[in-house]
């Protein structure tokens, strides 16, 4: 019985040690991957595509407005076979930005009245 208990404790200890090493390796790989992604994002951020311009070369290059990033929207023009992609802001995000701007403006008025 003592042998089984000792063997069980040894097995659990070895398993926890090996899993901790594997997690450390995964964490290191994740950090390296994250750093490379950040470097790519910084390099790509220099080439932003303005709103309503062609974004078919890089669909993630659209400008960022105050709160939200524009989306590359693709469609087929009427009577055409070629796909056209442009950076656009979805309407619901446009309305949310307008509401946030008005709330900010109203908050400034309240501060002025009571502050």
From Swiss-Prot:
Which tissues express it? Expressed by the venom gland.
Q: Which residues form the propeptide?
A: 21-44
What are the annotated GO cellular component locations?
extracellular region
Q: Where is the signal peptide?
A: 1-20
An annotated Gene Ontology molecular function: toxin activity
Subcellular compartments: Secreted
Cysteines paired by S-S bonds:
55-72, 62-87, 74-85
Any idea which UniProt keywords this protein has?
Disulfide bond, Secreted, Signal, Toxin
Q: Which family does it belong to?
A: Belongs to the neurotoxin 19 (CSTX) family. 01 subfamily.
Q: What is this protein called?
A: U3-lycotoxin-Ls1l
Which species does the entry assign this protein to? Answer: Lycosa singoriensis
